[in-house]
């Protein structure tokens, strides 16, 4: 698995400048001008994701994985129900918390809502969970379960998930894109670990989210419930960021988004408890 990650990183740092220049060229020609609004870090992250997708097939071949069952996954006849329930279990607690934050003055509603931005995050909430759950809970956790016991595999997969999402270079790290800009972004990706409050409020929440998603995957032997959970968290937090304005920052209690801080951590734990209760009383599932 280390070789797989190394290949992804090497591909990402080399490809990110090419993707950035191609996007800027298209925007300059009037083709998809919205591409000009994305900074280099966005293309760096997309290059890493592209590398992860491209190298899946040789990775699976090397591990001799021929079907989803080899990764501990089974057919889910109730996939639509699990998808919807997962979405509600994650989104509703976040929305309730957001209402409280607005009522207490921590956030205020914007006078003008950015509907185009809302549309973009809605698309993100539909696509990203499919890709990331297939990678993190489908592939990575499945591979770890082949050599580790259940909870060590869950903890390690959650750590991988949180580290990858927490690694992010500060804004404006790359002001002029060169061939080595990917290496510069990679070097600065660890800067956030130098801020203890951000580590406590951000990394910890992401780690717990990884635990919840892995738990949902194992309890159902399917990716549909974690996909729903993931989509609910993204949509509820991202749409709120577009229609509301934060009035104060109170790390480690509340960070720059509704997925960073001890308050969001508590909200995620509520979702986990509700998930466990629902699965305990849900009708028996057939595979």
Q: Predicted regions: what is each one?
A:
Residues 82, 147-154, 233-237:
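Small-residue-rich segments of transmembrane alpha-helices in multi-pass membrane proteins
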Residues 83, 87, 91, 122, ...:
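Residue-level signature of the transmembrane alpha-helical core
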Residues 124, 128, 141-145, 210-217, ...:
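Hydrophobic transmembrane alpha-helices
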Residues 131-181, 215-222:
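Membrane-interface helix/loop boundary segments of multi-pass membrane proteins
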Residues 187:
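Phosphate-recognition beta-domain surfaces
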């Amino acid at each position: 698995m280390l070789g797989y990650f190394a290949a992804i990183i090497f591909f990402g740092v080399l490809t990110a400048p090419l993707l950035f220049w191609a996007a800027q060229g298209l925007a300059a020609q009037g083709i998809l001008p919205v591409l000009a609004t994305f900074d280099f870090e966005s293309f760096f992250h997309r290059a890493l994701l592209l590398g992860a997708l491209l190298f899946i097939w040789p990775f699976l071949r090397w591990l001799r994985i021929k079907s989803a069952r080899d990764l501990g996954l089974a057919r889910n006849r109730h996939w639509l129900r699990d998808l919807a329930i997962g979405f509600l279990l994650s989104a509703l607690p976040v929305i309730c918390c957001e209402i409280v934050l607005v009522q207490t003055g921590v956030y205020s509603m914007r006078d003008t809502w950015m509907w185009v931005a809302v549309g973009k995050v809605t698309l993100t909430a539909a696509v990203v969970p499919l890709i990331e759950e297939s990678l993190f809970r489908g592939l990575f956790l499945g591979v770890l379960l082949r050599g580790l016991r259940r909870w060590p595999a869950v903890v390690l997969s959650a750590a991988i998930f949180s580290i990858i999402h927490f690694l992010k270079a500060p804004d404006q790290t790359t002001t002029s894109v060169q061939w080595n800009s990917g290496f510069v972004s990679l070097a600065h990706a660890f800067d956030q670990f130098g801020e203890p409050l951000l580590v406590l409020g951000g990394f910890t929440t992401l780690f717990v989210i990884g635990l919840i998603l892995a738990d949902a995957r194992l309890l159902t032997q399917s990716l549909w419930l974690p996909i729903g959970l993931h989509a609910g968290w993204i949509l509820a937090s991202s749409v709120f960021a577009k229609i509301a304005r934060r009035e104060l920052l109170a790390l480690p209690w509340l960070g720059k988004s509704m997925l960073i801080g001890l308050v969001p951590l508590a909200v995620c734990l509520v979702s986990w408890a509700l998930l466990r209760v629902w699965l305990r009383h849900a009708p028996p599932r057939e595979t």
